Amino acid sequence: MKPAGTDPRILSLAAEVAKSPEQNVPVILLKLKEIINNTPLGSSELKKVKQDIYCYDLIQYCLLVLSQDSSRIQGGWSTISQLTQILSHCCVGLEPGEDGEEFYKELLPSAAENFLILGRRLQTCFINATKGEEQDKLLHFFQIVTDSLFWLLGGHVQLIQNVLQSDHFLHLLQTDNVQIGASVMTLLQNILQINSGNLLKIEGKALHSILDEILFKLLSTPSPVIRSTATKLLLVLAESHQEILILLRLSACYKGLRSLLNKQETLTEFSRELRQLVDLLTPKIHQEVEEQKLHKAACLIQAYWKGFQTRKRLKKLPSAVIALQRSFRSKRTKMMLELNRQKEEEDLRLKLQLQRQRAMRLSRESRLNMLEIIHPGQVEKYNREMEEKSALTIQKHWRGYRERKNFRQQRPSLTEYKAAVTLQRAVLKFLAKCRKKKKLFASWHGLQELTDARRVELKQQVDDYVKRHPCSQMSEAASRELHAQAQERLQHYFMGRAIEERAQQHREALMAQISTNIEQLMKAPSLKEAEGKEPEQFLSRSRPVAAKAKQAHLTTLKHIQAPWWKKLGEEPGDEVDVPKDELSIDLGMLFIGGTKPP
C-alpha cells in the first residue's frame, strides 16, 4: 500500500524509472543521493523519504542493478559504488512497517551478500589491472563498497553473523594483495569493534578459517600494516572472549603459536600489542618437566608416524597422482557446470522478476487509463465489478486448494475403502463358490406328497375363487363398437393437438414480436436527439397492420383538425370514418420494411 503524502521528488523519480529503458535505470537511481543529501540528517523528514523509497521498490531496483555485470551499466564501477552508498544509507534508519519480515529476512541479507560479491569482483579487476591509475580507481571503489558495507552493518548488527559466515568474505580475507588485504582487515577490525559476540555464533569451521587467516597474515605477510592489524585483531578477540583464548592455548591446530610469536621481530609500531598477545597465550601455571616429556613423546610418535605415512605415500604415489589429477579435473568440471547453472538460474530469476514488475506496472497503467476513460458515475460500478472478479478468483483458488487438501487427507481412507471393497468382493465370490459346490453335492430328498384331505382343501379354495371372480364375456358387436369409439377419440385427440401446436407457435411469434417492439421503443432516442431517420425503424413488415396503423393515424388527425361544432354530438369512444381514396393514396407511398418497391 502506497503511503499518503508521498514526496513528489520520489514520486517523479519512480515514474521515470518505470518509464525508462533498462540501461538508463542506474543513472536515474543516482538522483536518490541528491535527495538524501538535501534532507536534514536524523530528521523525521529523512525517515519519511526512506519509507517512500522503500514503498516504491527503488531499493529493490538498486539491488537488481548491483547484481548485474558492471560492463552493462552506464558509468561502470563509479555508478555501482555510488549505488552501494545510496543503498546502505536508505537501509539504515528505515522503518519498513508492515513488510518488516521481508525487509529484515530477505532484503538486508541480500544487500550484504551483494556488497561482498561486488568486493570480490573489484578484487579480481584490481589484480588483473595493469595500469597504476586504473588500480587506484578500483581501490577507491573497493574502499567505497567496504565503507558502505560497514555502514550497513552498523545500522543492522544482526547481519554481522551472515557476513562472517559468507564464503565471499573469506575469499576477500584470503587475498595476497597488500592494499586489498589491509582494507579487508580494517573492515574486520571495525566489525568486531561494533559487536564481537557474533563471532562465537558462527560455525566452528568458519571461525577456524578466520583465525587461521589472521595468524597467517601475522606470521607470513611482510606488510607491517597488515601484521599490526592482525595483531590488534587477535588481541581484541583473546581479551574479549575466553573461548577463543582457550582455543589458541590448548588446540592442537595452534600448537607452537607462542614460540612463533616470540620469534617475530619487535617493531616499534605494534611490539606492545604483540607482547600483550604473547603474555595472554602463555599459561600462568604449567609443569615444565611434564611438558618436556610430553613434547619428546609427541616428537617420537610424530617421527614414527610421519615415517610410516611417508613410506606409505611413496608406495601409492604413482596411482595417487593419477587419481588426484582425475579428481581435480572432475571437481573443476563440476564447479564450472555448477557456476554456469547458478549463473543461468540467476539470469532467469532476474529476467522473470523484471518481467513480473513490468507486467505489474503495465497492469497498473492500464487500470489508471481505464479509470480515466470511464464516466465518473460508472467508476464505483467498475470498482465493484473488479472487486467481484478478484473475489471470484480468490475463491476459485481457495476452493481448489481446499479440495486438493481434502483429497490428500482422504486418500488413505479412500485407499482403505477400495481395499475393503476388493476384499469383500473376493470373499463373496469365494462364499458363492462354496455354496454352489454344496448345492451340487447335496442329496436329493424328493417332493413332499400331498394328502387326500389337503388336495380336497386346495380344490375347494380354487372353486370358491372362480365363483367370486367370474370372467366377463363380451359379444363381437360390442367389441367392434368399443374399438370404433377408441379410434374416433384418438383421431380427435391428434387433430386437436396439431391445432394447439399451431396456436402455440403463433403465440410465441407474437410474444417475440412484442418483445422486439418493446426493445426498439426502449432504445428510441428522445425528441431532442431524433434526426428524422428513426420513424423508419418502427414501420411494420405486414401490409394489413401498416394499413390499420395509417387509418388510425389519419382518423386522429382528422378528428383533431375538425371544427369544434362537428364534435358536439360525439362520444369519446366513437370512431371517425376515413375515405378509402385518401387511405389508398397514402398507402401507395408508404415504405414497408423488408419489401421492394414496385
From Swiss-Prot:
InterPro entries: ARM-type_fold, IQ_motif_EF-hand-BS, IQCB1, P-loop_NTPase
Tissues and organs where the protein is expressed, per its UniProt entry: Localized to the outer segment and connecting cilia of photoreceptor cells.
SMART domains: IQ
Domain of life: Eukaryota
Subcellular localization(s) per the UniProt record: Cytoplasm, Cytoskeleton, Microtubule organizing center, Centrosome
One Gene Ontology term from the biological process aspect of the record: photoreceptor cell maintenance
Annotated IQ domain residues: 294-317, 318-338, 387-416, 417-437
Domain notes: The IQ domains mediate the interaction with calmodulin.
This protein's name: IQ calmodulin-binding motif-containing protein 1
Native source organism of the sequence: Mus musculus
Classification lineage: Eukaryota, Metazoa, Chordata, Craniata, Vertebrata
